[in-house]
Amino acid sequence: MHIAIAGNIGSGKTTLTGLLAKHYGWSPHFENADNNPYLNDFYHDMQRWSFNLQVYFLNTRFSQVLELRNSGNTVIQDRTLYEDAEIFAPNLHEMGLMSTRDFKNYHSLFDLISKLIQPPDLVIYLRATTPTLVHQIQKRGREYENTIRIDYLEQLNQRYEAWFSRYSIGNKLIINVDNNNFEDNPDDLNKVITAIDGQINGLF
């Protein structure tokens, strides 16, 4: 079984992935931002590095999906392959930070790859308002994230809402992060687990 956590920057994907992996005994697959060779450059010069970054993400997530599908284990993944193509790349293109030529090239790669993989059995979307995202980004203190603009987060949030409302290739669940502190409150985490149990039981 393949479970995936989706959500904006700072929504708590990595934290929830770890907590759920521990609770259920699932194999976690994390987005390793610290080892990304483009991320720091991207946040300092988005226009120069946007295409490189998106292709890097596409490559690593495609490899990850193939690996987890072949493992035979129940896996929980931090961020989906679809978020890059449906949210981040179109947003960069609309902002003038990715050329039309690069955007078309990127999307042709995504269209090809998406035909070769199965979607997750369940996608959990962590919905959070911009103030919550900013608070959590500041809390974790990654230096390269200090330059993220508020309007950038807001635009991503709008795209997340639009994407998840039309997502129809698998089961889905929404967790409202503004009202659920699953990291520090065991009762809130139990609410998440109960909701997931209801979804998982419906898969069999």
Stretches with model-predicted labels:
Residues V134-F204:
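NTP-dependent small-molecule kinase module
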Residues L16-T17:
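Post-Walker A alpha-helix
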Residues I5:
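Hydrophobic anchor at the beta1->P-loop junction of P-loop NTPases
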Residues I87-E161:
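A glycine- and Lys/Arg-enriched "phosphate-lid" helix/loop adjacent to the NTP-binding pocket
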Residues W49, L53-Q118:
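Glycine-rich phosphate-binding loop used to anchor ATP phosphates in small-molecule kinases
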Residues K22-T60:
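Conserved substrate/cofactor phosphate-moiety recognition/catalytic segment
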Residues K13:
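Conserved lysine of the Walker
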Residues N8:
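P-loop (Walker A) phosphate-binding loop of NTP-binding proteins
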